[in-house]
Amino acid sequence: MLKVLEGPSLAERTTLRLGGRALAEVRVTSRDALDDLPGVLQCLGGSPLMLGCGSNILAADGELPVVVVSLDMDDAPTIVGETAEGVVVRVGAATRLPRLLGQLASWGLAGLEGLAGIPGSVGGAVAMNAGSYGCEFGTVLRSVEVFSPDFGLADVPHENIEYAYRHFGLKGCHGWFVVTGADIVLRRGESAAITAAMRANYLKKKSTQPVLARSAGCVFRNPAPGVSAGRLIDQAGLRGKRIGGMAFSEVHANFLVNEGAGRSDEAFELLQLAQEIVKRRHGMDLTLEVKILSWL
């Protein structure tokens, strides 16, 4: 079944708490309903925006020409087999990362401890190839279940998946698609040790990142291996820099935070300022990691 809502507020659906209204939101409550999704999107107009927990989105204010697509399917993590590479776990895209990590720890399955403290959904982690502390989601992917208007609902094996630093794609697919689930491969370990590692990683994040603030996570990609975007912003003198209600965090300069009454234009101004100063001082381009939604 598909549920259509008119004019959802993106400020209410994103962790930055910024943005105007989308044309509509389509909530997918079952896989059987996915076949109807292309027709519904065509009738509604606008570009489809796949949205999980909204933790990597910076949306402009005003009316935006997008239709939000969200999954309302509770696919709990399930062990479905074991191979020479490890234990295979199937998980739905709407599952929140903390829930997945907690289940993996209880099962004694290791491989994603570095993602502790990252908000968001499994679908978002796949789509952005989420990573932290030497761990990337793409490295544990065995296959991805996706829906596309080109080939319907399908399981895409690892060899047909493209992933790199904060990048995910499907070979031969050039249009939009919805990630609905994934099979991941983990290695066996000790539950207590895995839980301890996750807790240590979370506490480290909490002490070095504004994990409880209204933030979209890191806004810029690291421009090169070993080169931190946050350090470049800090060296540019922009740690704690404020414009209106938006600021680069005092805790970690690569985090843009909404201090309560921020506006999208203030956020865009800060991002542009950082790019200009870092380019002038270091000759390096800062590429956005956060997804921008605007009128264009």
From Swiss-Prot:
Localization per record: Cytoplasm
CC terms in the record's Gene Ontology section: cytosol
Biological or metabolic pathway of the protein: Cell wall biogenesis; peptidoglycan biosynthesis
Principal subcellular localisation of the protein: cytoplasm
GO molecular function terms listed in the Swiss-Prot or TrEMBL record: FAD binding; UDP-N-acetylmuramate dehydrogenase activity
EC class: oxidoreductase
Protein EC: 1.3.1.98
ATP-binding is among the record's keywords: no
Keyword NADP: yes
Boundaries of every FAD-binding PCMH-type domain copy: 18-189
InterPro entries: FAD-bd_PCMH, FAD-bd_PCMH-like_sf, FAD-bd_PCMH_sub1, FAD-bd_PCMH_sub2, MurB, MurB_C, MurB_C_sf, Oxid_FAD_bind_N
GO biological process: one example: peptidoglycan biosynthetic process
Reaction catalysis annotation: UDP-N-acetyl-alpha-D-muramate + NADP(+) = UDP-N-acetyl-3-O-(1-carboxyvinyl)-alpha-D-glucosamine + NADPH + H(+)
Coiled-coil annotated spans: none
Keywords: Cell cycle, Cell division, Cell shape, Cell wall biogenesis/degradation, Cytoplasm, FAD, Flavoprotein, NADP, Oxidoreductase, Peptidoglycan synthesis
Needed cofactors: FAD
Pfam families per the UniProt record, alphabetical: FAD_binding_4, MurB_C
Entry annotation: catalytic residues: 166, 218, 289
HAMAP family: MurB
Its job: Cell wall formation.
The family this protein is said to belong to: Belongs to the MurB family.
Full protein name: UDP-N-acetylenolpyruvoylglucosamine reductase
Source species of the chain: Nitratidesulfovibrio vulgaris (strain ATCC 29579 / DSM 644 / CCUG 34227 / NCIMB 8303 / VKM B-1760 / Hildenborough) (Desulfovibrio vulgaris)
Organism lineage string: Bacteria, Pseudomonadati, Thermodesulfobacteriota, Desulfovibrionia, Desulfovibrionales
